[in-house]
Amino acid sequence: VGPMVGMNLDASHLMWMGGDPIAAVHKLGADRIYHVHAKDVRLERNYVGADGVLDTKTIDKFAKRTWNYVALGHGHDVRWWKEFLSVLSMEGYDGPISQEMEDLTMPALTGVKKSTDVLKEAMPCDYE
């Protein structure tokens, strides 16, 4: 990591593995984070307890997976996203935050709208 290579912090990847994206922001600091993906994860209770998180089923098998990518707010609530974005800001990150929509439980445009609404509410300052 340096001026030419930095981290694309995708919170969802840490989430499904049991990591803590907020702790990762504190550890990495803004000088190592070059881009942030806003993507959420939901652990599926009916399966994850018995099978764990190392699910090898493809994303299209979402009804039987132990975890799934979901629209923002459908895995972690707005309060969590407020804290995540606030910590990014406190650490000095002011770069892009991109939505990545992979929620197959709803139409893509619905998921984008729901995620956008969560991001707008969670942002530490007003963006239009």
Report residues per predicted region.
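A structural motif corresponding to the C-terminal end of an alpha-helix
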Residues: 1-3, 83-94, 125-126
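A short pocket-lining beta-strand/turn micro-motif at the edge of beta-sheets
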Residues: 32-34, 68, 84, 93-99
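Conserved, mostly hydrophobic/aromatic
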Residues: 10, 36, 88, 97, ...
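C-terminal helical cap(s) of enzyme catalytic domains, especially alpha/beta-barrels
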Residues: 108-127
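Soluble or luminal CAZymes and related metallo-dependent hydrolases
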Residues: 17, 76-80, 111
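A short, acidic, flexible beta-alpha connecting loop/helix-capping segment that sits on the rim
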Residues: 98-108
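Acidic/histidine-rich catalytic cores of soluble enzymes
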Residues: 1-74
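A general structural detector for well-ordered alpha-helical segments in enzyme core domains, enriched
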Residues: 24, 80-84, 103, 114-119
